[in-house]
């Protein structure tokens, strides 16, 4: 066993002595040592229940004849961090999580790992670590939150609260109505109830094969999640016995399948960023052109909030992720069904008995929302290395208009609230990319303000930053190269005409190459917003969004 490095041989007597101080007995040194990588944090509702959850995982690991050791990672609640300096720390926290998990697990030579993530950057951070460490691993997330209901019976979620702010600001609802939405938008523990980033990543984790069937959709408060815990411990033991590791599971084909589900469900645009980072950790050469190829062959079968009033509980009721995959598998060339997963079985075996139980929630191949996926990769002179739009969250497929430029999210939100943005405008929020932000903050507050004011179909928004999974409308993010790197978005001037064509996958500014070259020569990079601390280091090390915004390793040659 891998853990023999710290427990076998006469020279490991000091190690065993220390381990006995934690409560271990001599007989425990013949069992696999399992890292329980938890993320219990009281300020994050998606993680509030994970302390008790971790206890159940440890019980299941002991029952399976293994020895559990629990530790916790950090985490950032993107909703609470939204709209202020806290959002700059969100994406960088992914790297800290990956590094911290790698540190604990490799320092102590664990034989296997069960990861308990739930919210936005915690899930991809742990997945990156699992691929980096590459020991048998099973993920079992904390589960989605239920949707809420206002006193009038209206179904609401976190995106409803954000949009309620814009609606109140524009006089569309009263302060009492906003308070009603606020009080009921997040009714329980769990990851926010729509197809936002957390649930998108937990669903993708299931499809990749690192998590068990049901992981993405079973609610946090559902007793079936306890059964999932027990099964996770049993399956981990099998993975250890068969030496099946994350890099055996997360192949290029598995990533294709993860993006295929993403396209079928219209997941968060953040999945592109995180899954490219996973490919990097797995040592795979996977780029945005391959994502676009998946988008072209996968129909959009589900619309989940913010694209509709359906939530994760409805997906679960309709058959879960397995039912969506089973329906997708009817179309030749969409899924790779014979690859191994954390169950020890193939994807084909995992979904064999799944079926759609509600075709209003999960559409059939014969009745898709659209023939192509709910995410699109756009390119053009404004995004030479690519940009991403959640096409399933807008009915508008082509938009052209003059740009209104803001050099930060705060500046943009203030401008929107003051009425500086009109119908037909293209809002540009720049210098918010991985380097420029720094940290590539999400633009949920501006998109929600625009939607809440009733301009969601009449105003487009472009940024080198990110969007929350709760964002909707004509929102194009991840524009690469970013402004801080001298990308075309940095060269835009007030009133320039921008064209967004979703069907043609085009993002262009209507000015000549000669004019762009002239502006590029005159452009000067602004001073970094942050020069010290973690964010200062991050800004110097981070790469572009089109490569997953991973950190570059210095060249020591």
UniProtKB/Swiss-Prot annotation:
SUPFAM superfamilies: IlvD/EDD N-terminal domain-like, LeuD/IlvD-like
Gene Ontology biological process terms, A to Z: isoleucine biosynthetic process; L-valine biosynthetic process
Cofactor: how bound: Binds 1 [2Fe-2S] cluster per subunit. This cluster acts as a Lewis acid cofactor.
Required cofactor(s): [2Fe-2S] cluster; Mg(2+)
Molecular function GO terms recorded: 2 iron, 2 sulfur cluster binding; dihydroxy-acid dehydratase activity; magnesium ion binding
EC number in record: 4.2.1.9
Protein residues bound to [2Fe-2S] cluster: 119, 192
Catalytic activity: (2R)-2,3-dihydroxy-3-methylbutanoate = 3-methyl-2-oxobutanoate + H2O; (2R,3R)-2,3-dihydroxy-3-methylpentanoate = (S)-3-methyl-2-oxopentanoate + H2O
UniProt pathway annotation: Amino-acid biosynthesis; L-isoleucine biosynthesis; L-isoleucine from 2-oxobutanoate: step 3/4; Amino-acid biosynthesis; L-valine biosynthesis; L-valine from pyruvate: step 3/4
Residues at which Mg(2+) binds: 78, 120-121, 442
PTM annotation (N6-carboxylysine): residues: 121
Keywords: 2Fe-2S, Amino-acid biosynthesis, Branched-chain amino acid biosynthesis, Iron, Iron-sulfur, Lyase, Magnesium, Metal-binding
One term under GO cellular component: cytosol
Active site: 468 (proton acceptor)
Stored InterPro entries: Dihydro-acid_dehy_C, DihydroxyA_deHydtase, DiOHA_6PGluconate_deHydtase_CS, ILV_EDD_C, ILV_EDD_N, IlvD/EDD_N
Function: Functions in the biosynthesis of branched-chain amino acids. Catalyzes the dehydration of (2R,3R)-2,3-dihydroxy-3-methylpentanoate (2,3-dihydroxy-3-methylvalerate) into 2-oxo-3-methylpentanoate (2-oxo-3-methylvalerate) and of (2R)-2,3-dihydroxy-3-methylbutanoate (2,3-dihydroxyisovalerate) into 2-oxo-3-methylbutanoate (2-oxoisovalerate), the penultimate precursor to L-isoleucine and L-valine, respectively.
Family to which this protein belongs: Belongs to the IlvD/Edd family.
HAMAP family according to UniProt: IlvD
Protein's recorded name: Dihydroxy-acid dehydratase
Species assigned in the record: Bacillus cereus (strain AH187)
